[in-house]
Structure formats: structure tokens, C-alpha cells
């Protein structure tokens, strides 16, 4: 449901969009849906359901086809909002020798904490007006993202961190890594607006929880499902620890979310 929206979001920011279709079986219908959207996949794979480790492997494989070029890495429900023009950030990287730019999740949720229905005509920014940080407190799922990087820079499972010389670059001790674009007080840290939380998410959380497979990170999904169940099937947007703020302006306005500087400190500590 989010793919048309994510394509539209990035189409003017990048030179090419590489869509990798991950189907569970050759007749699960996902490939037909992609083609009906007018999208020609770069690659189609058939793999077990919810194998997030395989997904990361595919990201790294595709990026390595152009190791010296810059890539934007995004799942179909992740919408980057940059603190300044993306090309300007890349120019900064080229001038200073940085090879990857990091960011963190801002969770988007509907009116009163509900999970809205989405179709290809939905204005997702208006349909999910509340922005905050509830996924990590409820499930301990990592909120860090490695967002933009040279093709040769690999990412960890979940695309949470960059890998340099076999080392995962994470935590406060790597905040000023020489190849990492400095996050600063938010002026170098990309907002990843996460539109995972639509009307289909509860069934997906339940389905992943049932797998009991390590590569699905099922325990995080189980925690999240139980937390939502205990909250009357909504997100309690009144909780201060969720940093909820209602956003009204243009979605490209990075600084509209006024809690970003404070939230950054929590994210980079994970």
C-alpha cells in the first residue's frame, strides 16, 4: 500500500530507483501488483516470509553494483526528511571524506492514535498527523537507520548501522567516526518518518510473532502487538515518553518536528 507513495517521495531526489521485489512464493501476487503500478523491478527474489536478514543482504548486494556512487536506502514505509538539501549533504561528504549519513525513526500514527487505512490516493502526511517515538519504548526495536551511503558501505540487519572494516558503527563512542556525517544537534541527522502503522499492521505483527524464527526478530513484534493490545488497540498519544507532536506544515520541513534535538539524544544512545 505504501509503495506508490514512497516512489513519489523519492523520485525527484535520486537519479534512479531500484525496486527489489521480495515474494514469498512465485504466485503470491506481489509481482503483479508491482507491475500494475508501472514499476519494472530491478530484481525479483523468492525467499521465506519475513526474513529481514535476507532483505539486508539484498540491499548490500544491489549497492555494491555501484560501489563509488551514493545510495539512498529505504524500505517502502520509510520516508526521509532531510535537514538540508540531500545534494548539499552529499557535497559535504565528498569535501570531508564522509561515506555514510545516519538518521532515526519518527513514528507516524493517525488521529487519536488509530491505525488508518491507506490506498494509493491517500495523503499520508495528513492521514498520519501525529509524529513521535513509540516503537522503541514499546518493543525495544532499534530506531537508528543508516540512510545514505556510498555503495561500498554495507549496512547491518535492519539497515540500522553502517559497517566499516567489519565493525558495526553504533553508539555514542562512534558518534564522531571519521567516515560518518556528523549528526550534530540534528542538523546532520536524517528524520526517517515511519508509516508502518496503518490498518494492516496489527495482522502483520501477529503473523511475524507466530514465526518464532530468529531472522524475523519475532520477539520485538510480539512485544509491540501485546503493547497495542493492552492499550485498547491504539497508541496512547498522551504519553510524554512518546514525544508525540501534531505536524501541520509541508512534509519536507525537517524542523517542524520541534522535539527532534531531544529525540536524537535518545536514538543515538541505542
Language-model segment annotations:
Residues 52-57, 82-270:
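Catalytic-site signature of metal-activated, phosphate-bearing donor transferases
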Residues 26-74, 81-82:
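Active-site-proximal specificity loops/subdomain of glycosyltransferases
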Amino acid at each position: 500500500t505504501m509503495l506508490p507513495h514512497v516512489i513519489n517521495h523519492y523520485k525527484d531526489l535520486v537519479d534512479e530507483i531500484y525496486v527489489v521485489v521480495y515474494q514469498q512464493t512465485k504466485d503470491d501476487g506481489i509481482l503483479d501488483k508491482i507491475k500494475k503500478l508501472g514499476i519494472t523491478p530491478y530484481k525479483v527474489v523468492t525467499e521465506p516470509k519475513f526474513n529481514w536478514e535476507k532483505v539486508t543482504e539484498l540491499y548490500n548486494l544491489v549497492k555494491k553494483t555501484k560501489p563509488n556512487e551514493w545510495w539512498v536506502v529505504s524500505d517502502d514505509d520509510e520516508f526521509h526528511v532531510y535537514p538540508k538539501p540531500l545534494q548539499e549533504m552529499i557535497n559535504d561528504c565528498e569535501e570531508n571524506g564522509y561515506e555514510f549519513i545516519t538518521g532515526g525513526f519518527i513514528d507516524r500514527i493517525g488521529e487519536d492514535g488509530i491505525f488508518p487505512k491507506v490506498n494509493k490516493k491517500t495523503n499520508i502526511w495528513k492521514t498520519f498527523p501525529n509524529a513521535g517515538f513509540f516503537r522503541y519504548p514499546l518493543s525495544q526495536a532499534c530506531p537508528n537507520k543508516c540512510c545514505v551511503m556510498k555503495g561500498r558501505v554495507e549496512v547491518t540487519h535492519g539497515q540500522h548501522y553502517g559497517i566499516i572494516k567489519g565493525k558495526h558503527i553504533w553508539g555514542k563512542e562512534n558518534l564522531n567516526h571519521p567516515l560518518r556525517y556528523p549528526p550534530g544537534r540534528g542538523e546532520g541527522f536524517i528524520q526517517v518518518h515511519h508509516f508502518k502503522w496503518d490498518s494492516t499492521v496489527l495482522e502483520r505483527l501477529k503473523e511475524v510473532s507466530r514465526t518464532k524464527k530468529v531472522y524475523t526478530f519475532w520477539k520485538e513484534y510480539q512485544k509491540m502487538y501485546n503493547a497495542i493490545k493492552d492499550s485498547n488497540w491504539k497508541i496512547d498519544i498522551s504519553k510524554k515518553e512518546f514525544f508525540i507532536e501534531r505536524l501541520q506544515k509541508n512534509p519536507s520541513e525537517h524542523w517542524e518536528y520541534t522535539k527532534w534535538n531531544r529525540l536524537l539524544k535518545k536514538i543515538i544512545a541505542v
